[in-house]
Curated annotation (Swiss-Prot):
Residues recorded with modification N6-acetyllysine: 597
A GO BP entry: intracellular signal transduction
Induction pattern: Up-regulated by lipopolysaccharides (LPS) (at protein level).
Post-translational modification: Ubiquitinated. Ubiquitination by PJA2 does not lead MFHAS1 to proteasomal degradation but positively regulates its function in polarization of macrophages.
A Gene Ontology molecular function term of the record: ubiquitin protein ligase binding
InterPro entries with a match to the protein in the record: Leu-rich_rpt, Leu-rich_rpt_typical-subtyp, LRR_dom_sf, LRR_domain-containing, P-loop_NTPase, ROC
Annotated PROSITE patterns: LRR (PS51450), ROC (PS51424)
Gene: Mfhas1
Gene Ontology CC entries for this record: cytoplasm
Protein name: Malignant fibrous histiocytoma-amplified sequence 1 homolog
Upper lineage: Eukaryota, Metazoa, Chordata, Craniata, Vertebrata
Length: 1048
């Protein structure tokens, strides 16, 4: 069912919970719950049935709960000992038929729950005796049929026979005149049971997940029906008689084959909730428009292309789901639905939202991603309705402005030729010789160019149309991998540069394949152009063969990835086709114990990955920077792709003129040269742009979201500052990620001598102190450089020396370090509490520089080695596997993110040892050892079994932090597993892995142990697989620079 629980009016979503609550034992009755010692294990696996003995003097007990005991029979003397019993719970046992002793209770028993057993037959005599029964739950059994005697239960009001094997219902069902609630979902019915048409008192009916294929015309006889579930019933049409169900309030028709509704459907005037998701509607059903009382409407996953303007007539609508259709625009009248609280539009083709959209101010659940939005821009829409309102208000205040500007990223292996290609593309040819100043170098010959890190260039590609590219030259050196993902953003054009002169087919995975996986994981559906450089160094035949090989291997990689994902999606489908009880019966089953909801979420993710493959332009474009014709051909290609509106809608986005002016003012002298501005400095610029203070916030937020500047409104340390000079920030990042000891030492020596302005000089390859310098000081600085490159450690005052050309004051340094922490690049080892940083006191750790493979030995002293605890403690280990690609820099950034959660940490290159309070935790990264092996990242802790909750308490925040980081990679395929504690204790090299989805599910009721499939005789305590409370599966994304800056 589509929708989320929110508010009292979510009727259908709450009906099941309400029914379950109604069936729970009444608190004013005298109750008794009995449990067998050791009961609660898997009832399908345990060989011996437990025995229960009734205590004495229980004659006045009115409610008896014998559930979750693995019983095959009831205790001796049950019938004679309980003369006052009204409610009997026998759920989750092993009964193959109703125990005869239950018949002795028939004259006073009103409620019986025998769900989740092995019933294959009820027994006519026992059923006949239950003449006072009002509620009967037989769900989740193996019943092929029901006895005719069931129809004689004249007082029966609620009956649940869902999740059985019923192919038909007995004729006597028509005699259940008091039946108000009937649940027959997930059975094997092949037609709507005619017997039900006689049940005039029926108010709630669920016949979902049966192959009905049609409904009888006289279904109109069920005039009392208020709630009807027909999900997944293979219905193609509805009879006219259906429209006579005038009492209907909630109707579930999702997952059918409906293409239209009868005109008479509009007679269902009491309808408040309607789910038509996952059908075949191509047009919005006109019969819905007169349903003025409708409060929830779900039309997800259909084929709608438009929404009628008359939808404004549904004035009571609170929830509207229209996601994953083909809707190109919304009617202006939709803004009149001012009571809307949920509006889901993602996965459509909407480019422009109606004016006054901000009137929908009550919308709390808002989903709009995967639409080609240009007005308001995508970044504004993703922030929510208040930001859309501010944008539209500002657009009304000032003239709209369109500024065609596209982000272009040059990626590729080191020495691929990116920097030379950037120069050739962005600079005009000057005939004859070398130009100077603004003049361009000629094509022959080129001096060798090397990258100085990440560089940004503005390129006016077509002055007549004002089309500009912002060109990012991403360094190919591995040391920059941790910051490269920040620049990969939606709406950009990716140019993957390959050196054809050195390319060999065996090098494809490192020079092409890994980059495609990386971009696809970070930016699903991104547009990628493959450019081969140094074409002049290849023969004609060699050039053709290499280009064809790249093309062939790209196609093969895409084919293999898509087939792998399709297979995984099929496995999920097969698991969904099996009953949840069957999946939970055996740990050998795929997706053991995983709920249908989690499986559907998994399937949706696989479908998303399959539907959002990279858009790789072919063929490979060979280019020589010495050939002006080839360069011009590449320019023309890039321009033609950029101007494709369906591929790059953001190129034509419309902004309020005041927002554009504000951006331009930030980059004009004198403020353009500063590293940052205070919020009040930006506010003054806002006034010049015509923005009052209350309208400035939305403008700054948009400029941040779109990557023009950095403004962290959620950060106490940074919210009073605006980082507008991104070029200088990138220069600063380059300083930290040049792993060249000579360059770093040279910068420090310049800094100590006050010669920081020599940044643009050509550095010597070996830093030698000048005669005027103190050799002791030079030695000390060399020691700092060595510590940085080996252990990632730098004190704040040395960082200031490194950044002296950029950092003028202590406040600059403090803000910059706060920014680097927010980016996840470093953390402070000893930040003073309650007072500002003292330059020489604070030390910073850059995890990406740590070289020692494992943490220092002293961290493992005093019994803290997990391996050494195998005989006295149970180990918890959560493992993430990455079959296609491991996000570059993820482990380093993760080690920063968890710093606030841990103490006494010791870092290795691939491992972190630390404590959460007094509980040890270990985070380990294991790179893939071969093409077929995945990269893995695991989080582990240990404790004795009675205290295992402390281990869960230790690792759960770390798991959630990792989940937050992984949200930055929406196209990434990865799996999560809980490793078997017993296997780990045995030292198994290949421990069994329970599905990670169990982390977000509550512990199964009444189950104490789970069998490990790797060793059928070994049982794992349920507390070693399920956390005490479910973890957050999709935590709210934290506002961090890694997510925001990449949207430039």
């Amino acid at each position: 069912m589509a929708g989320q629980d929110s508010g009292n009016l979510k009727t259908v979503r709450l009906w099941r919970d309400a029914a379950l609550r109604a069936r729970k034992l009444r608190s004013n009755l005298r109750q008794l719950t009995l449990s067998c010692p050791g009961a609660g294990g898997d009832p399908l696996e345990s060989p011996d049935a437990p025995q229960l003995v009734l205590p004495a003097n229980i004659g006045d007990i009115e409610v008896l709960n014998l559930g979750n005991n693995g019983l095959e029979d009831v205790p001796e003397g049950l019938g004679s000992a309980l003369g006052s019993l009204r409610v009997l719970v026998l759920r989750r046992n092993r009964f193959a038929r109703l125990p005869p002793a239950v018949a002795e209770l028939g004259h006073h028993l009103t409620e019986l729950d025998v769900s989740h057993n092995r019933l294959t037959i009820l027994g006519a005599e026992v059923v006949s005796a239950l003449r006072e029964l009002r509620k009967l739950n037989l769900s989740h059994n193996q019943l092929p049929a029901l006895p005719a005697q069931l129809g004689a239960l004249a007082h029966l009001e609620e009956l649940d026979v869902s999740f059985n094997r019923l192919a038909h219902l007995p004729d006597s069902f028509s005699c259940l005149n008091h039946l108000r609630t009937l649940d027959v979902d997930h059975n094997q019915l092949t037609a709507f049971p005619q017997q039900l048409l006689q049940l005039a008192a029926l108010e709630e009916l669920d016949v979902s997940s049966n192959r009905l294929r049609g409904l009888p015309e006289d279904i109109s006889a069920l005039r009392a029906l208020k709630i009807l579930w027909l999900s997944g019933a293979e219905l193609g049409t509805l009879p006219r008689g259906f429209c006579e169900l005038a009492s209907l309030e909630s109707l579930m028709l999702d997952n059918n084959g409906l293409q239209a509704l009868p005109d008479e459907f509009s007679r269902l005037q009491r309808l408040k909730m309607l789910n038509l998701s996952s059908n075949l509607f191509e047009e919005f059903p006109a019969a819905l428009l007169p349903l003025a009382g409708l409060e929830e409407l779900y039309l997800s996953r259909n084929q709608l292309t438009s929404v009628p303007s008359l939808i404004a007539g549904l004035g009571r609508l609170l929830t509207l789901w229209l996601d994953n259709n083909r809707i190109r625009y919304l009617p202006d009248s939709i803004v009149e639905l001012t009571g809307l609280e949920e509006l889901v539009l993602q996965g459509n083709q909407i480019a422009v939202l109606p004016d006054n959209f901000g009137q929908l101010s009550r919308v709390g659940l808002w989903k709009i991603k995967d639409n080609p939005l240009i007005q308001p821009p995508y970044e504004v829409c993703m922030k929510g309705i208040p930001y859309i309102a501010a944008y539209q208000k500002e657009l009304a205040h000032s003239q709209p402005a369109v500024q065609p500007r596209l982000k272009l990223l040059l990626m590729g292996h080191k020495a691929a030729g990116k920097t030379l290609l950037r120069h050739c593309l962005t600079e005009d040819k000057v005939e004859g010789g070398q130009g100077g100043g603004d003049k361009e170098k000629s094509y022959l010959p080129f001096p060798p160019l090397g990258s100085k890190g990440i560089e940004v260039t503005s390129w006016t590609a077509d002055a007549s149309r004002g089309l500009r590219f912002i060109v990012y030259d991403l360094a190919g050196d591995e040391s920059y991998e941790v910051i490269q993902p920040f620049f990969l953003s939606p709406g950009a054009l990716y140019v993957l540069v390959v050196n054809l002169a050195t390319y060999e087919p065996r090098c494809f995975p490192t020079t092409v394949g890994s980059f495609l996986h990386r971009v696809g994981a970070r930016v699903p559906h991104a547009v990628v152009c493959i450019v081969g450089t140094h074409a002049d160094l290849c023969g004609e035949r060699e050039l053709e063969e290499k280009c064809l090989d790249i093309h062939r291997q790209i196609a093969l990689q895409e084919k293999n990835d898509a087939e792998g994902l399709s297979h995984l999606a099929k496995v999920v489908d097969e698991a969904l086709a099996r009953d949840f009880e069957l999946r939970s019966a055996s740990p050998h089953a795929a997706y053991y114990g995983v709920s249908d909801k989690n499986l559907r979420r998994r399937k949706a993710h696989f479908q998303y990955l399959l539907n959002h493959r990279l858009q790789i332009l072919s063929p490979v474009l060979p280019v020589s920077c010495r050939d002006p014709l080839q360069l011009q051909r590449l320019r023309d290609k890039l321009l033609s792709v950029a101007e494709h509106r369906e591929i790059f809608p953001n190129l034509h986005r419309v902004l309020p003129r005041s927002w554009q002016v504000l951006e331009e003012l930030h980059f004009q002298p004198p403020q353009a040269q500063r590293l940052w501005l205070s919020w009040w400095d930006s506010a003054r610029l806002g006034l010049q742009a015509g923005l009052t203070e209350d309208r400035l916030q939305s403008a700054l937020s948009y400029l941040h979201e779109s990557g023009k500047l950095l403004y962290f409104e959620d950060s106490p340390a940074l919210k009073e500052h605006v980082f507008h000079n991104l070029t200088r920030l990138i220069d600063i990042l380059n300083v930290f990620f040049q792993r060249d000891a000579s360059l770093l030492l040279h910068k420090l020596l310049l800094g100590t001598n006050g010669e920081g302005e020599g940044e643009g000089e050509s550095f010597p390859t070996i830093a030698v102190p000048s005669p005027g310098q103190d050799p002791l000081r030079a030695t000390q600085l060399h020691h700092y450089v060595e510590g940085f490159l080996l252990h990632g450690l730098l004190p704040a005052h040395i960082i200031r020396l490194l950044l002296k050309p950029h950092v003028q004051a202590q406040q600059d340094l403090q803000l910059l370090l706060e920014l680097l922490e927010k980016m996840g690049l470093c953390y402070c080892l000893n930040k003073p509490k309650g007072k500002p940083l003292n330059g020489s006191a604070a030390w910073y750790k850059f995890p990406c520089y740590v070289q020692n493979e494992v943490p220092h030995a002293e961290a493992w002293i005093n019994g803290t080695n997990l391996a050494g605890q195998s005989f006295v403690a149970e180990q918890l280990q959560i493992e993430y596997s990455f079959p296609f690609t491991f996000p570059p820099g993820l482990f380093a950034r993760y080690s920063v993110q968890i710093n606030s959660h841990v103490v006494h940490r010791s870092d290795g290159k691939f491992q972190i040892f630390a404590y959460r309070g007094k509980v040890p935790v270990v985070v380990s990264y294991r790179p893939a050892k071969g093409v077929l092996q995945p990269d893995t990242l695991s989080i582990a802790s240990h404790a004795s079994l009675p205290n295992i909750w402390t281990a869960w308490q230790a690792i759960t925040p770390l798991v959630e932090e990792l989940n937050v980081l992984l949200q930055e990679w929406p196209g990434l395929h990865y799996t999560v597993h809980i490793l078997c504690s017993k296997c780990l204790k045995r030292g198994s090299p290949n421990p069994h892995a329970f599905p990670g989805e169990l982390l977000s599910q509550p512990r199964p009721e009444g189950v104490a142990e789970i069998i490990c499939p790797k060793n059928g005789s070994e049982r794992v305590n349920v507390a070693l697989v399920y956390p005490p409370t479910p973890t957050v599966i999709s935590p709210c994304s934290k506002k961090n620079v890694g997510e925001k800056h990449r949207n430039q």
